[in-house]
Amino acid sequence: MVVKVGINGFGRIGRIVFRNAIEHNDVEIVAVNDPFIEPHYAAYMLKYDSTHGQFKGDIKVDGNNLTVNGKTVRFHMEKDPANIPWSETGAYYVVESTGVFTTTEKAKAHLKGGAKKVVISAPSADAPMFVMGVNHETYKSDIEVLSNSSCTTNCLAPLAKVIHDKYTIIEGLMTTIHSYTATQKVVDGPSAKDWRGGRTAAQNIIPSSTGAAKAVGKVIPELNGKLTGMAMRVPTANVSVVDLTVRIEKGASYDEIKQAVKEASEGPLSGILGYTEDDIVTTDLNGDNRSSIFDAKAGISLNKNFVKLVSWYDNEWGYSRRVLDLLVYIAKIDGNA
């Protein structure tokens, strides 16, 4: 059974989730809501993308709806999630990708319109967070609102799980070298809460905060309080990289650690955790479906208990694919797929 999904918020993640769904045989997007984009503009934004290229399919506007590859996608422009008629569209699940309704209470408004479950495509202060390949099997059908966590947590957590399961992480620090995003400025502008964050994204490396490392403790409870981190926003349009430095209890050579990650990437974490010994750079991974691609050549170890590991991720495409994978998984548990 195909999982019927609605998207609220047709920004970067909303549109990339839609594009991913076209390639995902188990998901059908039946409705989109965005109060700030009318249907013709939505069709244009879906068709043309500066980062991921032109949409490989047919997009038309039919009245107030979109027709994508011959299938009707209902389009609404409601500001209040409670007013979106999800039940009329057939959308059982909703991807909440506005970045606004990220708490359980706010996201639950979608249920008033007939949706049964909401997946927030961002970290949440109170909704349970899931990372595919790490803790997705803890999902229970009585959960109505859940979070797919962040793109960085989706990169970090699978790698941390492999290392912790094999060698036991004592403590660690993470830095994500992160491509700029829509929250940043094209030219210097006001940013009262984060002065450096207001500087132009295309000219600067900007130190910033991130909760991604601490969030790993929510999806891997044994690591709660053992990891923290920061971000460096850099002048690249897409694809980011995690630098994880950890002390491990059970000593291992760097070659042994590489082998452990390689085995996991070919086994239980296949499709989620990747492994490469190629001399890759950011653009080589644009459009990569995986959550985390371990760079075997980029890491180093000081000794058998202190190691730096490097793993790449497409912070748009790979993350959006995991949103859909999570939807398909919970639909199976719910008996709807």
From Swiss-Prot:
Location(s) in or outside the cell: Cytoplasm
Active site as annotated: C151
Name of protein: Glyceraldehyde-3-phosphate dehydrogenase
Binding site for D-glyceraldehyde 3-phosphate: S150, C151, T152, T181, T210, G211, R233
Top-level taxon: Eukaryota
Coiled coil: none
GO cellular component labels: cytosol
A Pfam family annotated for this UniProt entry: Gp_dh_C
Pathway: Carbohydrate degradation; glycolysis; pyruvate from D-glyceraldehyde 3-phosphate: step 1/5
